Amino acid sequence: MNVLVTGGAGYIGSHTCVELLSSGYGVVVIDNLCNANPVSLERVETLTGKKVTFYEGDVRDEGLLRKIFAENDISCVIHFAGLKAVGESVEKPWEYYDNNLNTTLVLTKVMKEVGMKNIIFSSSATVYSADNEMPLKEESRTGGCTNPYGWTKYMTEQILSGISHADPDWSVVLLRYFNPIGAHKSGLMGEDPRGIPNNLMPYITQVAIGRREKLSIYGNDYPTHDGTGVRDYIHVVDLAKGHVAAVKYATGNKGTEVFNLGTGIGYSVLDMVNTFMEVNQVELPYQIVGRRAGDIAVCYADPAKSKEVLGWTAQETLADMCRDSWNWQSKNPQGYGE
């Protein structure tokens, strides 16, 4: 069975390719490489000893998608492709709506044409309203997003749910990720953001390796145990395995289902910093600065449904995530560029 992975050269996509290949699936990737490096796919092949069929191009290119479906017997699509920086989405809303919504519309149009109606969407905890009680369950309130990135995820969920509702032959699985960090234990693959990292862990590792002077912690006056923001951090390999479980589910069921992929445990920014320094025996200079607009105090998942329905549970600890992130960065100081 072949799986088409859009955005498959990216951080989560490439780790998912490893788990799919290791589970016996064939993998076809389309990626325009706007925020990814094709070296990641070479590493996927090295780790698995299996071939990835790669098409460089944009998911909004209908002709290319038709070619991919004509040349490969695809049974399921995992749709990662999209722009993903919250702050940038506020500055460039048009680009985010154009990219993140139109990729889905073009992709599902071609899928409908060829009669292949199984799709797993890379959604996000940003679809949940900020005023929910914790932990977040799949039925917690959605909408009321605080930035265009979150709205594109919310709108894409609505598009896919609507398609599935109108045509019962569709199988739609919406995976709401929490905060993916970590790297493959081999140290061959990890997160390699372009420019200044938007996420906490790559910033930490770049400070630790000497590429950046110090870490800025945004706010220490939140109503949490140490005043810093609390999030549900999940190891990227656990997250990737969740996608394999979702493929099995999507190819055996119809309709729309939503799953949280998180650990169910919240850790603060300072918990992360202190754990990273402790397990890796490195110093991490940091400064406390003002809060970032749009950040909430606490966000963590209730992953019970994923365990019950998908048979999936996150296995890796925060210490594992910190250790694997540093292993990747220390072996690849410039990411895939070296």
Residue ranges: model-predicted function:
Residues 24, 150-151, 195, 263, ...:
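Residue-level detector of secondary-structure boundary/capping sites
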Residues 97, 146-154, 190, 194-198, ...:
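Short-chain dehydrogenase/reductase
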Residues 186-188:
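Catalytic core of nucleotidyl cyclases, primarily class III adenylyl/guanylyl cyclases
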Residues 1-183:
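N-terminal Rossmann-like NAD(P)+-binding domain of SDR-like oxidoreductases, especially those catalyzing
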Residues 57, 96, 144, 192-196, ...:
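Pocket-edge positions in alpha/beta enzyme catalytic cores
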Residues 200-338:
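C-terminal substrate-binding subdomain of Rossmann-fold SDR/epimerase-dehydratase oxidoreductases
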Residues 182-184, 221-222:
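Short, basic/glycine-rich phosphate-binding loops at helix/coil junctions
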